[in-house]
């Protein structure tokens, strides 16, 4: 303590107060890019001038995004911590400009290679760019990539390559074997080695990544851009591999591995980045309209495809594993979405073919408003605006009593649930092609007698629905014509009894009604695309489906139960 003028003790200087200490404790307050808070002194002005004049090359766009996502400050922080934050922010300000400034200056937030993109934009916007690579299989990812930080996501792709490199024989790519990462045991699941080791064609466009066998045009996977959440490749430790995480109905969320020898991995990952940037520009030119979702109905069944990463536990009888949402008749439900999504935490490919591209969020497209859904025969309608050409899908054996009570008591139109109306996975499973082939061989039909489109059906060019004719079904004793659910259930006496009926509410919808464990089941036989199918097998007609399961004694697997066809409930003459 020192003596001031007049002998009085001068007060001690107050400890410096951090900026966070002056703010109330409101965790929802968040300041983007604290490094941009410049001081008033000449030193700060020199720093700002240096940042504008001499940007440091080689810093990936990921740093700019992470700089804009500083952690929330919920409590006063000490001065040293603030100094570290201020120092890191200054480095970010010198090295990478703001993401918004980057978009204004260059028209994109992904750093292009020094020589520009490899392909013309018109080609990526149109037919796309194809590469011949080696498919290594995929490994299930049990956690949402959005819930993981960037380093963990990178480790997930590395660990997936590490596992498949040993499991797939004849690999030629350069890879240094590493010990299994036990920390990722709860994130990575089982592997799927079907088609592993095959030479395939990967087509990259603004629509997504399409994997197919060149010789037969068989579709292995078709991942839309909205379903791809992370991509990585061309690193120094994985120069011959590209890994990306995407969702599809067969593998759910999985990490797919492509082996690209002779430096092709960098070209592939660069083309993916170019396609994503062009898709994002399309999104900016046609942003979605905000739609106020209706109130969720209480006591009714939830949507089968859920919101975002969360899906309902109910299964469709004739859907593939993964709860593929129905298309709602002839109307493509991908053209409408109930809520716009924010594109956040976007990473870049880095300067000169950087290996990482992160967090490709869903790009919602809204092509029309949603409407009201009228009640219909105990089925949940997939698209409120679709024509009633096919009966709505039924949740099998879930809340059956509630559905019956609703059919008897509800007289007012129901409101649609606030579930998204876009199909994130626009692909029919590649297993369908094999099942169709096996089923044709079992029926004595050679592949040569079938049209090429039926030998290997292509997901985007599936033929239009062709409903069975009434004359064909009238020849079958188990067909009862137009009949309600309640009337059909009264005809069932024992387990295994079954009949086929035409829906009263939606003529042209054919439903299999059977008894299992004392409970009636109603199974939709024709999917929205006009294909007669079960969860595993495609059939030529409803008669083919019934005869196949009746003569072979095979059950129809519906959700987590089985429906056996033993006793035909014949119609009255």
UniProtKB/Swiss-Prot annotation:
Gene3D superfamilies reported in the protein's UniProt record: Pleckstrin-homology domain (PH domain)/Phosphotyrosine-binding domain (PTB), SH2 domain
GO molecular function: receptor tyrosine kinase binding
InterPro entries cross-referenced by the UniProt entry: CEP152/SHC-Transforming (IPR051235), PH-like_dom_sf (IPR011993), PID_Shc-like (IPR006019), PTB/PI_dom (IPR006020), SH2 (IPR000980), SH2_dom_sf (IPR036860), SHC_SH2 (IPR035676)
Top-level taxon of the source organism: Eukaryota
Record domain SH2: where: 478-569
Sorted UniProt keywords: Phosphoprotein, SH2 domain
Pfam family, one: SH2
Matches recorded under SUPFAM superfamilies: PH domain-like, SH2 domain
Function (record text): Signaling adapter that couples activated growth factor receptors to signaling pathway in neurons. Involved in the signal transduction pathways of neurotrophin-activated Trk receptors in cortical neurons.
Subunit structure: Interacts with the Trk receptors in a phosphotyrosine-dependent manner and MEGF12. Once activated, binds to GRB2.
Domain comment in the entry: The PID domain mediates binding to the TrkA receptor.
Full protein name: SHC-transforming protein 2
UniProt organism field: Rattus norvegicus (Rat)
Taxon lineage: Eukaryota, Metazoa, Chordata, Craniata, Vertebrata
């Amino acid at each position: 303590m020192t003596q001031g003028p007049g002998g009085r003790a001068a007060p001690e200087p107050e400890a410096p107060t951090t900026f966070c200490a002056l703010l109330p404790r409101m965790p929802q307050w968040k300041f983007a890019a604290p490094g941009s808070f410049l001081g008033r002194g000449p030193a700060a002005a020199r720093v700002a001038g240096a940042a504008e004049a001499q940007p440091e090359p080689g810093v990936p766009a990921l740093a700019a995004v992470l700089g804009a996502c500083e952690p929330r400050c919920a409590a006063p922080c000490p001065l040293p911590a603030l100094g570290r934050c201020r120092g890191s922010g200054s480095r970010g300000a010198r090295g990478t400009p703001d993401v918004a400034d980057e978009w204004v200056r260059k028209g994109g937030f992904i750093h292009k290679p020094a020589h520009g993109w490899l392909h013309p934009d018109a080609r990526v916007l149109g037919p796309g760019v194809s590469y011949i690579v080696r498919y290594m299989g995929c490994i299930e990812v049990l956690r949402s990539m959005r819930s993981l930080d960037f380093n963990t996501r990178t480790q997930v792709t590395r660990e997936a390559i590490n596992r498949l490199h040993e499991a797939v024989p004849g690999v030629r790519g350069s890879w240094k074997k590493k010990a299994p990462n036990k920390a990722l045991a709860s994130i990575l699941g089982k592997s799927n080695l079907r088609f592993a080791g095959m030479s395939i064609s990967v087509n990259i466009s603004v629509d997504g990544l399409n994997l197919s066998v060149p010789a037969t045009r068989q579709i292995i996977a078709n991942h839309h851009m909205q379903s791809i959440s992370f991509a990585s490749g061309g690193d120094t430790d994985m120069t011959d591999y590209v890994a990306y995480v995407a969702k599809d109905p067969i593998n759910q969320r999985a990490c797919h591995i492509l082996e690209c020898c002779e430096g092709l991995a960098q070209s592939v990952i660069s083309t993916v980045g170019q396609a994503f940037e062009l898709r994002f520009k399309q999104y900016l030119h046609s942003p979605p309209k905000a739609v106020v979702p209706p109130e969720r109905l209480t006591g009714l069944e939830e949507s089968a495809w859920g919101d975002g990463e969360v899906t309902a536990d109910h299964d469709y009888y004739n859907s593939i594993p993964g709860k593929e949402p129905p298309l709602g008749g002839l109307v493509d439900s991908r053209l409408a979405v109930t809520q716009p999504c924010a594109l956040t935490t976007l990473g870049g490919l880095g300067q000169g073919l950087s290996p990482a591209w992160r967090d490709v969020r869903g790009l919602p497209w809204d092509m029309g408003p949603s409407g009201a859904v009228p009640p219909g025969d105990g089925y949940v309608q997939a698209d409120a605006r679709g024509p009633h050409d096919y009966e709505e899908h039924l949740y099998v054996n879930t809340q059956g009593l509630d559905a019956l009570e609703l059919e008897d008591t509800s007289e007012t139109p129901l409101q649609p649930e606030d579930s998204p109306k876009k199909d994130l996975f626009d692909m029919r499973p590649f297993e369908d092609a094999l099942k169709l082939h096996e089923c044709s061989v079992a029926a004595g039909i050679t592949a040569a007698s079938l049209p090429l489109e039926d030998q290997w059906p292509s997901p985007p060019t599936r033929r239009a629905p062709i409903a069975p004719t009434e004359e064909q079904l009238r020849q079958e004793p188990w067909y009862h014509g137009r009949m309600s659910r309640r009337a059909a259930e009264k005809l069932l006496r024992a387990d295994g009894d079954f009949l086929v009926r035409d829906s009263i509410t939606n003529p042209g919808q054919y439903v299999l009604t059977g008894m299992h464990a004392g409970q009636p089941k109603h199974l939709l036989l024709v999917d929205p695309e006009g294909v007669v199918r079960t969860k595993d097998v495609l059939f030529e007609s409803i008669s083919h489906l019934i005869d196949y399961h009746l003569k072979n004694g095979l059950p129809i697997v519906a959700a987590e139960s089985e429906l056996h066809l033993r006793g035909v409930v014949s119609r009255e003459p």
